[in-house]
């Protein structure tokens, strides 16, 4: 519900009053939207006019809301946040089906991530040994070839 109210002064003050409802309570607000003068009028007279319009509006009653705070634990014990006990559950970062469990105790029966890491380290160690043996064979073969050239 909105009304348009004008004031009778040498100039005109147009106010826009609107009524709003919030949770069963009714509020009415007034806002000056346009002030125009044909002659010079003191600012004091304009303010009196606006005050008059504001007092002529309907008074609003505000219902106070009450809130009841209920304790979650009737015995008064304070509960802290739930911490991870290391049992199953989703880890923070889960790649595939494995991944090492959820942050706390290691992961329980889900050991695929550790097995994969161990396998990769074992493979790299094997490749390192294989490369050492390959280099040693080449050096021996090259040394033997050089000796044969000098003997002929």
Curated annotation (Swiss-Prot):
Residues 52-69 have a biased composition (Polar residues). Residues 52-99 are annotated as: Disordered. Residues 1-52 form a transit peptide. One of its GO terms (biological process) is thylakoid membrane organization. It is found in: Mitochondrion. The keyword Transit peptide applies. Keywords: Mitochondrion, Transit peptide. One of its GO terms (cellular component) is chloroplast. Restores fertility in rice varieties with LD-type cytoplasmic male sterility (CMS). CMS is caused by genetic incompatibility between nuclei and mitochondria within male reproductive organs. Corresponds to the functional allele of RF2, which is dependent of the presence of Ile-78 in the japonica cultivars Fukuyama and Owarihatamochi (AC F1SZ42), and indica cultivar Kasalath (AC F1SZ41). This is Protein FERTILITY RESTORER RF2, mitochondrial.
């Amino acid at each position: 519900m909105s009304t348009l109210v004008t004031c009778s002064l040498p100039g005109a003050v147009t106010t826009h009053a609107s009524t709003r409802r919030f949770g069963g309570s009714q509020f009415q607000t007034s806002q000056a939207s346009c002030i125009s003068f044909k002659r010079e009028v003191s600012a004091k007279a304009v303010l009196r006019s606006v005050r008059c319009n504001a007092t002529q509006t309907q008074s609003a009653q505000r219902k106070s809301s009450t809130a009841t705070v209920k304790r979650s634990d009737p015995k008064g014990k304070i509960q802290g946040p739930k911490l991870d006990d290391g049992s199953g559950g989703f880890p923070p970062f889960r790649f595939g089906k494995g991944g090492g469990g959820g942050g706390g105790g290691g992961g329980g029966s889900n050991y695929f991530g550790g097995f994969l890491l161990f396998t990769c380290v074992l493979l790299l160690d094997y490749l390192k040994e294989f490369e050492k043996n390959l280099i040693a064979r080449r050096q021996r073969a090259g040394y033997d070839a050089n000796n044969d050239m000098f003997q002929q």
